[in-house]
From Swiss-Prot:
Primary gene name: tpiA
Catalytic activity: D-glyceraldehyde 3-phosphate = dihydroxyacetone phosphate
Keyword presence, Isomerase: yes
Localization, UniProt: Cytoplasm
Protein name: Triosephosphate isomerase
Record InterPro entries: Aldolase_TIM, TIM_sf, TrioseP_Isoase_bac/euk, Triosephosphate_isomerase, Triosephosphate_isomerase_AS
Record's function text: Involved in the gluconeogenesis. Catalyzes stereospecifically the conversion of dihydroxyacetone phosphate (DHAP) to D-glyceraldehyde-3-phosphate (G3P).
Length: 223
């Protein structure tokens, strides 16, 4: 199972250093199935027992792109895993860069956690699968370092996860399109994680607020 933590705009370098130290000690050995996405200002240079990923980046090595992170910056911290397509980035105008980001990350051999998800109106209109398929049309579903995270927008940050029957329907559909690992994200917590992980085709979870405290993240990993 893959356990990924998106820390979003939380943690400083000092606090994430403590987070990483505790997680490293608990794990004891390197595990590529544990991924943590800290904010970029908190990136750590030292080797960890988990994969450190980037929440955002610009599809360039470097250049005249004010305020952006290029490959050169990720390389400095040994980062080879990126999050692409999160709804909070799409809402900020990231939609037009998604294909360029994917293509760049693939070209450079990055592990990619690619997020897809529908809003409540799309769900209620019965067009979820059609919508998700369209979101996936711009990427290579056979890329060997791809992970797809299904995060229904109506569940992100609301404390209310999607119904397991809805999750199962979506993951079964996605499994018919690709053989890459499939994650669920959206208000994952200690009360629902076991049920979510028991859904057929679920290969793990992308966790938000429930992973902000390292002790909670460890508890979710251990089950």
């Amino acid at each position: 199972m893959i356990f990924a933590a998106n820390l979003k705009c939380n943690h400083t370098r000092a606090s994430f250093k403590i987070y990483a130290e505790i997680l490293n000690k608990t794990m004891g050995a390197k595990c590529d199935d544990i991924i943590v996405f800290p904010p970029s200002v908190a990136f750590l240079e030292n080797e960890n027992n988990f994969i450190q990923g980037a929440q955002n980046f610009y599809p360039c090595v470097n250049g005249a792109f004010t305020g952006e992170l290029g490959k050169e910056h990720l390389d400095e911290f040994g980062i080879k895993c990126v999050l692409i397509g999160h709804s909070e980035r799409r809402a900020l105008g990231d939609e037009e860069f998604i294909k360029a980001k994917f293509d760049f990350a693939k070209e450079h051999g990055y592990k990619i956690v690619f997020c897809i998800g529908e809003n409540l109106d799309t769900k209620n209109s019965g067009k979820t699968l059609e919508f998700l398929k369209k979101q996936l049309e711009i990427i290579d579903l056979n890329y060997e370092k791809l992970i797809i995270a299904y995060e229904p927008i109506y569940s992100i940050g609301t404390g209310v996860s999607a119904q397991s029957t809805d999750i199962a329907k979506v993951l079964e559909f996605l499994a018919s399109l690709t053989k890459v690992p499939l994650l669920y994200g959206g208000s994952v917590n200690e009360n629902n994680i076991k049920e979510i992980l028991s859904v057929n085709h679920c290969g793990g979870v992308l966790i938000g607020s429930a992973a902000l405290k390292v002790e909670n993240f460890i508890k979710l990993i251990k089950g």
